[in-house]
Amino acid sequence: MGLSLDIGCGAHKNPGTLGVDRRSLPGVAVVCDFEQGLPFLDGSVTAVYLHNIVAHMDDLVTFMEELYRICEPGAKVYVRTPYYASREAFVDPTHVRYITEATFEYFDYPNYYGLKTNFKIRSTYFKMRKPFKFMPAYFQKRFRRYLWNACIEMDIELEAVKPI
């Protein structure tokens, strides 16, 4: 069985995962600049948690290629990020990109623009503000796309598709 990583965990690592961060903090087992590579063997990881970290990535494409390298076939990647049309996306001055529900479709094609990734989007969940969260999904979709700050963040589950 492979590793379960929490990359960019800070001091709040998910239980049962190996903490990976740029800084040495409580719960962090591996200190590295994960945008410069990940110190794990090819195909050695079964699950990766990326909670509130992708908006900070200078080079998301290279990071996703590196992530794909270390994932075993079928590995799950759990992304949580501020929704691009939310206040939370703009409050943090260290955010360098804004993530939409379509961002990870870019990594969903093998050799798309020469990428070395094939992550399939398995699910997407949107955390809506009140009163929007009590509305039917059809209305939530419209409000999150066309109304500023209706959606706070989103969770995306990806799966690494590789030959076995």
What positions do the PLM features span?
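Short, Lys/Arg-enriched, disordered terminal segments
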Residues: 1-2, 164
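S-adenosyl-L-methionine-dependent methyltransferase catalytic module, highlighting the catalytic core
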Residues: 58-66, 72, 76-164
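Conserved SAM-binding loop
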Residues: 2-85
